[in-house]
Amino acid sequence: MSKPEETSDPNPTGPDPSRSSSDEVTVTVADRAPSDLNHVSEELSDQLRNVGLDDSAKELSVPISVPQGNVETDSRALFGSDQKEEEEGSEKRMMMVYPVRPDSEDCSFYMRTGSCKYGSSCKFNHPVRRKLQIGRERVRERDEDVENPKLMECKYYFRTGGCKYGESCRFSHMKEHNSPASVPELNFLGLPIRPGEKECPFYMRNGSCKFGSDCKFNHPDPTAIGGVDSPLYRGNNGGSFSPKAPSQASSTSWSSTRHMNGTGTAPFIPSMFPHSRGVTPQASDWNGYQASSAYPPERSPLAPSSYQVNNSLAETSSFSQYQHQMSVEEFPERPDQPECTYYLKTGDCKFKYKCKYHHPKNRLPKQAAFSFNDKGLPLRPDQSMCTHYSRYGICKFGPACRFDHSIPPTFSPSSSQTVEARQVGANGNEDDSWH
């Protein structure tokens, strides 16, 4: 039996890397004898078997990496998201996620919230029962809130307006028996009077309050306070003004003058707000000398009688007294401020108690030696007649006017009636004489 010729390897230096393993196996099998084929097949089967085992081992040896960023989410992914499991299973999972270290200190964050962001790497103790106790406490508090919803006091019930929900309110109205006088007393403006509280600053400056009866501050009644130092009529810089005192003085002077008449008939009194025919007050500062007559003296339907003219001196003296007292009260003294130049010149100031300058009382201009007529206008015989007063019977300057406001000497009731008759005959309409 002849041996097969051995062929020399064309590449003695080593295997060609470009040739695959299958080519090498084919060449080897072709060159070998048939008796060696069984041995080669066994080697190939062993290699294939080992390759499958290595792949399966690699698949089994892949580590399961769990990130530590969100332990609670990872625990749900590992152990399921069902929240209705039994306590034993939840305790086991808690032990796996959060370490129990009896020798260490309790984790403060875990004791408060029932969770820990460090998870199994935390070095503190995590009692297993803590999270379960927190859940039970929350459920218990929720049940208590449902059973007792009226644990908090209703903040609207104890105000003046009360609670609009009434008995259906979910908050407590339990102080109704303990505080029967919860509704405060109201002043004449309908604002609450609270003696123990601080005075409402807006009300003390302006006399009104936008909060109304719900305001928690005190709103004293100015009629009960009275006096010159009433805080309701304070100026911007501390000055005070109370119109109550002048009104009382004026009412006293008018009443005393009324009783001075010996005939028993009340004399003519210049009213501050008269209701004469054809006159309608249009402003709050409408004065008596402006609204006392809307017609010329020769056309006035109510001509003054002789006793009214005779008693005018008594009326003017009381009016001048009232005016002087009012000027003293309504102009504030502010020693730390500059003096009001207009007040020093004229004795008057249009800002009155709101003026921020000083109004010294001892430097008031001297009262001129003249009297006033029955309308409160000055009688200055040495001056010319006031044209506005001679035409219309009123003067917008009032007592400060520098002209004369005496009754025209040609005035008489008969002449006024004659003038009226002429106008009625000429126009043919009685109403034309009044317009």
From Swiss-Prot:
Residues 247-256 have a biased composition (Low complexity). Keywords: DNA-binding, Metal-binding, Nucleus, Repeat, Zinc, Zinc-finger. A zinc finger (C3H1-type) spans 101-129, 148-176, 194-222, 334-362, 380-408. GO terms for molecular function: DNA binding; mRNA binding; zinc ion binding. SUPFAM superfamilies: CCCH zinc finger. It is found in: Nucleus. Residues 1-91, 235-274, 412-435 are annotated as: Disordered. GO terms for cellular component: nucleus. The keyword Zinc-finger applies. Pfam families: zf-CCCH. PANTHER family: PROTEIN PHOSPHATASE RELATED (PTHR12506), ZINC FINGER CCCH DOMAIN-CONTAINING PROTEIN 67 (PTHR12506:SF20). This is Zinc finger CCCH domain-containing protein 67. It comes from Arabidopsis thaliana.
